[in-house]
Amino acid sequence: MSSERTFLPNGNYKIKSLFSDSLYLTYSSGALSFSNTSSLDNQKWKLEYISSSNGFRFSNVAEPNKYLAYNDYGFIYLSSSSNNSLWNPIKIAINSYIICTLSIVNVTDYAWTIYDNNNNITDQPILNLPNFDINNSNQILKLEKL
């Protein structure tokens, strides 16, 4: 897997699940989940390319000093620390990406995976799991530029 830059312009995005095609990544009450679309800032994500690291960082528009990061248990959460917050979006189709962990690309590729509870991803965690699969719709996200 290459860690070359995927071209994505800096700016605000909504992150939509391809699995449901109608649910968006939402930050609410200290937790991340997927819910129906709204115009609130808690569903808007600022994407910023960090050239010194050749990776991208996501921050929530409602909480601009917090970043999407992963912990040792594989959970993706909003953190006030920039540790473990660099990502490599791999484009697989128009506006469709698998988002991999930048720090461990070329070792075992880890990617965002939406936990699926009987075909219902509402209020389910987002995990950083090994072995991404372009055929796994739980790992494919649409980035909609605002």
From Swiss-Prot:
Gene Ontology CC annotation, any one: extracellular region
InterPro entries, per database record: HA-17_C_botulinum (IPR008903), Ricin_B-like_lectins (IPR035992)
Record keyword Metal-binding present: no
Keywords tagged on the record: Hemagglutinin, Secreted, Virulence
Subcellular location(s) of the protein: Secreted
Matching CDD domains: beta-trefoil_Ricin_HA17
Subunit description: Botulinum toxins are produced as progenitor toxins of large molecular sizes of 12S (M toxin) and 16S (L toxin). M toxin consists of a non-toxic, non-hemagglutinin component (NTNHA) and the neurotoxin. L toxin consists of the M toxin and the 3 subcomponents of hemagglutinin (HA). HA is composed of subcomponents of 70, 33, and 17 kDa. The 70 kDa subcomponent undergoes proteolytic processing and is split into HA-55 (also called HA-53 and HA3b) and HA-22-23 (also called HA3a). Preliminary crystallization studies show a tri-lobed HA-70 where each HA-70 contacts one HA-17 molecule.
Name this polypeptide is given: Hemagglutinin component HA-17 type C
Species assigned in the record: Clostridium botulinum C phage (Clostridium botulinum C bacteriophage)
